[in-house]
UniProtKB/Swiss-Prot annotation:
GO terms for molecular function: large ribosomal subunit rRNA binding; structural constituent of ribosome. HAMAP family: Ribosomal_uL14. The modification Phosphoserine is found at residue 17. The modification Phosphotyrosine is found at residue 38. Its main location: cytoplasm. This is Large ribosomal subunit protein uL14. It comes from the Eukaryota. It comes from Pongo abelii.
Length: 140
């Protein structure tokens, strides 16, 4: 992804275990009025025959709102995954996982639609998306 695509972020995205395939329903952790997000595609995945595209922490996905405000439902929104239940390994060797899968709705530039995030945000996501990091309550 280009620097502009991640909201002007710098630095490489390290490989992490992908725990959220297309079709997964994740919690919406911002104050936009959406309760959950249904992943319909993952940005930047080219694909392989019969393999479901999957997302991990820090990935931008295209999602629809299944529960929430009526004005958000039945539309496709870009979102960024901020937490996942599947454990992944950090460069220092520690394995980390969260108690839920969660994401936040953003625009195409990576700027958040909401103004607050409930719960922790993964450090990998905060490094890639500065606008999400600035709204995060805690970074884990």
């Amino acid at each position: 992804m280009s620097k502009r695509g991640r909201g002007g972020s710098s630095g490489a995205k390290f490989r992490i275990s992908l725990g959220l395939p297309v079709g997964a329903v994740i919690n919406c952790a911002d104050n936009t009025g959406a309760k959950n997000l249904y992943i319909i595609s993952v940005k930047g995945i080219k694909g392989q025959l019969n393999r479901l595209p999957a997302a991990g922490v820090g990935d931008m996905v295209m999602a629809t709102v299944k529960k929430g405000k009526p004005e958000l439902r039945k539309k496709v929104h870009p979102a960024v995954v901020i937490r996942q239940r599947k454990s992944y390994r950090r460069k220092d060797g520690v394995f980390l996982y969260f108690e839920d899968n969660a994401g936040v709705i953003v625009n195409n530039k990576g700027e958040m639609k909401g103004s607050a995030i409930t719960g922790p945000v993964a450090k990998e996501c905060a490094d890639l998306w500065p606008r999400i990091a600035s709204n995060a309550g805690s970074i884990a």
